[in-house]
Design a protein with these regions (language model features):
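Conserved phosphate-binding/catalytic loops in two-lobed NTP-binding clefts
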Residues: 298-311, 618-649
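Conserved phosphate-binding catalytic cores of ATP/NTP-utilizing and phosphoryl-transfer enzymes
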Residues: 2-23, 304-350, 369, 645-663
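Early-domain small/polar-rich strand-loop-helix modules and first-structured segments
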Residues: 2-227, 370-385, 390-392, 397-422, ...
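Acidic, glycine/GT-rich loop-and beta-edge segments that sit at the periphery of enzyme/chaperone cores
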Residues: 19, 32, 48-52, 87, ...
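Phosphate/ATP-binding catalytic cores across multiple sugar-kinase/actin-like superfamilies
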Residues: 3, 7-12, 17, 21, ...
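Gly/charged contiguous loops adjacent to phosphate- or pyrophosphate-bearing nucleotide/cofactor binding elements
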Residues: 201-224, 232-237, 402-610
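Glycine-rich phosphate-binding loops at beta-strand->alpha-helix junctions
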Residues: 271-289, 594-618
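A short acidic Gly-Thr/Ser loop motif
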Residues: 28-34, 340-358, 362-366, 402-403, ...
Length: 991
């Protein structure tokens, strides 16, 4: 077992015997409302005889349901007689009674199951109309079946986290069960314990209950919060991170418990590899803490590459292939735009969950990468090798925008509706209450009175609108409702029970009123009875004398629900629309947007997307957009996978990343006619998903990074992809914002205190601002570094190279008067050459009769004084720095794996032009995890060197180095903790 307890990991001695590792991994999706875990276990690979297990079960179920249904349900457009004849003929051919036909699909006899399908297709009768109806229904069933994700065939196991209910989802509500070695309970057990504790609690014990139960620990992520917890008379202070870490530990324990108790076989070994998802717009402080906190649980390999929106996209992409690459790939290609041997489409993921909204816009490109077969090689049955490359065009979202925000708005509406009803009933004499009468007579705001009496509906109208927060009376209405029905428990723990009872009613109202309205457009309603209202008032000391209990009820309808939910839903869909339009808008503003790139596939995820008002709002916004072709077939929402999709998608993505293989090795499979698919998951991290801007004195922000910028591996010893800004001036306060799309919200991402640095360097302000330069660096996790330097940076040279002195004329120095006298080049089209130009790929360009297809590396005659860099050496015995040039990125290496450099000369006697070979530099023998650019340096000693990535800076770990010119000091951006808007936090105690 893993050392899940928080305090044990640091005290443990290394074991003498190496731990036995579980050969797979698990993916954790810790949600605001619910959590799931998916396990990858390679212990056995099932062989499908008909279809993968999940698809076969769905096909059996759907056919059984269909053939057992009456004609009016099975095929509404055909006559009952035709349907009965159809069933009778199938039953006769299968030698079974029509009433027992469904048994064929429930038995394990596969031959009989296949024969039943054959008989369905043979028994279509003579009526063309009937045949069309049956064929259409069969197509719908098959289409649904082929879209069932084949989890088992991919060795992916949704972990049953709630053993008693056999449920793979568990509510994220948590109860602290142990303070020493902090432990939690989660799910319905925690929820039931909370209800029981509140019902039995006294005023004193309620404080303990508030400290012990946490409805949704995820909402604390990234916050520097402390929680005083009282348990069994002991009190301790715990941090938000400890609470979340304990929740992960509990999910891992539940996964281990399932492995021990499940009837299936599992591989042995300790869980030491994990994939952990996080919200798409989580700041880098969250991403960094995820990895650290899970590692502290004894998990030594933690992957945090996949945010929630990207994970959902990978899941539904996998579902799109239907578990059959031969059919799935061809089906996928028909929905793409083809250009040569590439097929592409744009996918927008909109995941509105319980607490957060996550978005990702991804370009999927399928490319035929089938290896070349030599003439003597057998091509066999001609399978194809495809590579699918997802490119992240942009991501966005909101950390406090989801289903719980909608429930909170229904909570407020319901609370005010109850208060309005009770005050009206007192005014009309339908009930008597001294407390409410005193409230009307002495405390009620005048806007709610008419001739000294409560004005019916005056409270409700303040909230029964789309954006009630903008109404000046909004707060007054809520404050008045609080006097009737107190639920604000932050300062009064005794109100906790009323809050949770009303919250449960609001959640029930959301689920009922959020359904699709009846066909006759009659209103859906949700009603609280007199008994339910009385239960709510038990804690408020409001005593009622009711004349007619049947007349006491409060009703909301679906129109009121939609008005309350509208602003949150429009906000989420507005973010999606803004992201889509900003990324797909043509660069040329004169170009017609209707002819621009479009979103080809919209994936909806998260249970909030099941609300009818969400789907109607999506139609309203997307159907008229020039960036989306409205087609219901290309809008995917599958309720049963709305939560599992995140952990399953992340688990599958990690499988693809770890089990990649070379196309050449697939030839034996291709000969058998089997298509192969590689999904280049890592490509998701090669481009920036959003903009970053720097605050200036005016309202205009300075863009430092643009969405879509390509990331590269800057140093061979690093395992991240990065991009840097140019060197720029520093400010006393350097503030960085994230902006997902133009005109989108600005999120404070981090800051760097230049004034503090200035004081440490003992510089005057004018000197500091003039001398100190800053360069920002960002990686694929959106984590910033701040590079600082006085003046221009110096570079560190620590690799060998080739000497140009042997080919450069003795009478002509390499550098003179601050200029380069010789040119160096590689392939590419260029202007007229000068003596001394140096090139690469000269021989390659001559081979293909393209003598101009070289690439100029260093050019003669340029004013090099501004381009010369200062070099410091770690080898060659050099004790003094020198000067030199750094090239732009070189073109790709030829197949030889080396660039050959030539110098251009004109023979003084014959006036003939020629290239003289300097020598070759091989591609550095380093393995890079991400795309890498290569550069060469040329110093004043005539040494030409090849570098992988950026030429490294001359650096120091001490800030004191900034007192001398050229030394680079690396600092970190001061990250911002998550700021929580209490108006959007249902469980902060102020509602």
């Amino acid at each position: 077992m893993n050392p899940f307890q928080l305090n044990k990991y640091s005290d443990q001695e290394p074991s003498e015997k190496q731990q036995k590792r579980f050969p797979g991994w698990f993916a954790l999706d810790f949600g605001t409302s619910n959590s799931t875990v998916t396990l990858f276990d390679p212990i056995e690979v099932p062989i499908a005889e008909i279809l993968p297990k999940e698809q076969e079960m769905r096909l059996r179920d759907r056919l059984s349901q269909w053939l057992s249904s009456p004609a009016s349900v099975a095929l509404p457009d055909v006559s009952a007689d035709d349907w009965e004849k159809f069933i009778a003929e199938i039953s006769r051919n299968l030698d079974i009674e029509p009433s027992r036909l469904s048994e064929v699909f429930e038995s394990d006899n596969k031959e009989r199951f296949l024969e039943a399908i054959r008989q369905i297709e043979l028994s279509l009768g003579n009526s063309e109309r009937f045949r069309r109806a049956v064929s259409k229904k069969l197509y719908q069933i098959y289409h649904e079946v082929f879209r069932v994700p084949t989890l088992e065939s991919q060795n992916l196991i949704p972990v049953v986290l709630d053993i008693d209910r056999r449920d793979t989802e568990i509510p994220s509500e948590s109860e602290i069960s142990q303070l020493s070695d902090l432990k939690l309970r989660m799910g319905r057990e925690a929820r039931d314990n909370r209800k029981k504790a509140i019902a039995q609690g006294t005023s004193g014990s309620l404080k303990e209950i508030i400290s012990r139960f946490h409805h949704s620990p995820k909402r604390y992520f990234g916050q520097e919060r402390l929680f005083p917890v009282i348990l069994d008379g002991e009190e301790e202070i715990i941090t938000a991170n400890q609470l979340i870490q304990s929740a992960w530990a509990h999910l891992i324990e539940l996964t281990e418990d399932y492995r021990q108790r499940a009837q299936r076989r599992f591989s042995e070994g300790d869980f030491l590899t994990a994939v952990v998802t996080y919200p798409t717009v989580a700041p880098p402080v969250v991403r960094k803490e995820v990895k650290e906190l899970v590692e502290q649980l004894g998990i030594d390999d933690v992957q945090t590459a996949y945010d929630e929106a990207v994970s959902v996209a990978i899941f539904f992409l996998w579902r799109e292939f239907g578990g059959n690459l031969n059919i799935g790939i061809e089906s996928f290609k028909t929905r793409c735009h083809q250009a040569g041997n590439k097929w592409s489409q744009n996918v927008l993921v909109l995941d509105i969950g319980g607490g957060t909204t996550d978005l990702a816009l991804i370009e999927l490109t399928l490319e035929d990468k089938t290896p070349t077969f030599a003439d003597y090689e057998d091509r066999g049955l001609g399978g194809r090798y495809y590579k699918l490359t997802p490119k992240l065009l942009g991501s966005s979202g909101h950390l406090q925008l989801g289903g719980e925000l909608i429930t909170l708005r229904i909570f407020r509406l319901l609370k005010v509706a109850i208060a309005d009803f009770l005050l009206t009933a007192v005014t009309t004499g339908d009930l008597e209450s001294e407390k409410l009468e005193d409230l009307i007579n002495s405390e009620l705001n005048e806007r709610f009175l008419e001739q000294g009496k409560f004005k019916t509906g005056s409270l409700l109208k303040c909230l029964d609108k789309e954006n009630p927060e903008g109404d000046i009376a909004y707060k007054d209405a809520l404050d008045t409702a609080e006097k009737v029905l107190p639920t604000r428990w932050q300062q009064a723990p005794q109100r906790l029970q009323s809050f949770y009872i009303l919250w449960d009613h609001a959640e029930a109202a959301k689920l009922k009123l959020g359904q699709k309205p009846p066909a006759d457009n009659s209103l859906l309603t949700f009603t609280l009875s007199e008994q339910q209202i009385s239960e709510l008032l038990t804690q408020s000391a409001v005593k009622l004398q009711v004349k007619d209990p049947n007349s006491i009820c409060v009703t909301l309808d679906n129109q009121q629900f939609e008005r309350a939910a509208a602003s949150g839903i429009k906000e989420a869909i507005g973010i999606a629309k803004g992201l889509m339009e900003s990324r797909l808008r043509p660069d040329d503003i004169t170009k017609d947007s209707w002819n621009s790139q479009k979103v080809d596939w919209l994936i909806l995820s998260g249970k909030t997307c099941n609300l009818d008002v969400v789907q109607r709002q999506i139609y309203q916004e997307f159907s008229k957009s020039p960036y989306f072709v409205w087609n219901p077939e290309r809008i995917t929402f599958v309720l049963e996978f709305t939560k599992l999709a995140t952990s399953a998608g992340a688990c599958y993505a990690e499988k693809l990343r770890r089990l990649r293989f070379d196309p050449e090795e697939s030839k034996s499979l291709l000969r058998k006619g089997a298509n192969q698919l590689e999904i280049d998951v890592k490509n998701l991290f090669y481009y920036l998903p959003c903009n970053f801007k720097r605050k200036t004195q005016s309202n205009d922000l300075l863009t430092i990074f643009k969405a879509g910028q390509e990331l590269y591996q800057l140093a061979p010893w690093e395992t991240v992809a990065k991009v840097r800004t140019v060197w720029q001036g520093i400010q006393l306060t350097n503030i960085i914002y994230r902006q997902d799309y133009e005109d989108g919200d600005l999120r404070l991402w981090g800051s760097f205190d230049g004034k503090n640095l200035m004081n440490k360097l003992e510089m005057q302000e004018a000197e500091f601002l003039k001398k100190i330069k800053v360069q920002f660096e960002i990686d694929q996790t959106l984590e910033f570094n701040v590079l600082l330097c006085q003046g221009n940076p110096h570079y560190l040279i620590d690799i060998p190279g080739i000497d140009l002195e042997s080919v450069v004329s003795e009478t002509s120095a390499l550098f003179a008067d601050g200029k380069l006298n010789w040119n160096i080049a590689v392939e590419g089209f260029n202007k007229d050459l000068n003596d001394g130009d140096i090139a690469v790929n000269v021989i390659e360009s001559a081979t293909v009769d393209q003598p101009d297809a070289y690439h100029l590396v260093f050019e003669v005659g340029n004013d090099g004084s501004k381009l010369f860099q200062k070099f410091h050496y770690l080898r060659d015995g050099a004790t003094q720095p020198g000067i030199g040039l750094i090239s732009n990125p070189l073109p790709p290496f030829p197949q030889t794996g080396q660039h050959t450099f030539y110098v251009y000369q004109t023979d003084a006697e014959t006036n003939s032009k020629k290239w003289i070979r300097i020598g070759a530099l091989s591609k550095p023998d380093v393995t890079t995890d991400y795309p890498c650019q290569y550069r060469v340096t040329l110093d004043d000693q005539g040494i030409l060197r090849m570098h992988a990535g950026e030429v490294p800076y001359w650096t120091s770990n001490s800030q004191e180095c900034l007192k001398q010119e050229g030394c680079v000091y690396l600092a970190e951006l001061e990250l911002q903790p998550n700021e929580v808007d209490k108006e959007r936090d249902p469980f902060c105690g102020i509602h």
